[in-house]
Amino acid sequence: SVITALFPDVYIDSEVVVGNNCYIASGVKLLGSVKIGNDCIIRENTVIGSDGLTTRRDENGKVVTIPQFGGVTIEDNVQIGALTVIGKGAIDDTVIHSGCRIDNCCFISHNVQLGEDTLVVGETIMFGSSSTGKQAFISGNSTVRDGVSIGEKALVGMGSVVVKPVPDGGIVKGNPAKQKE
């Protein structure tokens, strides 16, 4: 089947590639180099491929924005909730591997890598270059610091602020997130 359902007010840039049997709800924006696999669902008013805020200070202390040249790759059988933003990679792509589920109102920043079958629950923020292994579970309203990795089958408790790597199978909770005893 090659049926892909597009609803009103969807914007798709010319570089975007959408696979077969996808559902793209109203108000979705697909920007720049975005590749979407087969059997994906993208809910209302989600933005994929937007620039993130990557900055540095110059020698005079002025903020300088660093351009981003990557894209976003979304593999097969991924579901993305409403009002979610997935930023494009700085150089390489942000990648959402097959089977992932991202809830409503999440922010997935540049260069994030979500392992297969990972669940990210509502209002979670994953900052630049953070990652998960396969089958990780990030509970709602959690924050993952830039560059931090969450291991395979690891669990992040609700409202946690993850500032250090979480090992495979680890369970963390709190602010800052600590290993559950």
Segments from the language model and where they lie:
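Glycine-rich hexapeptide-repeat left-handed beta-helix
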Residues: S26-G27, L31-E181
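Right-handed parallel beta-helix
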Residues: S1-G37, E44
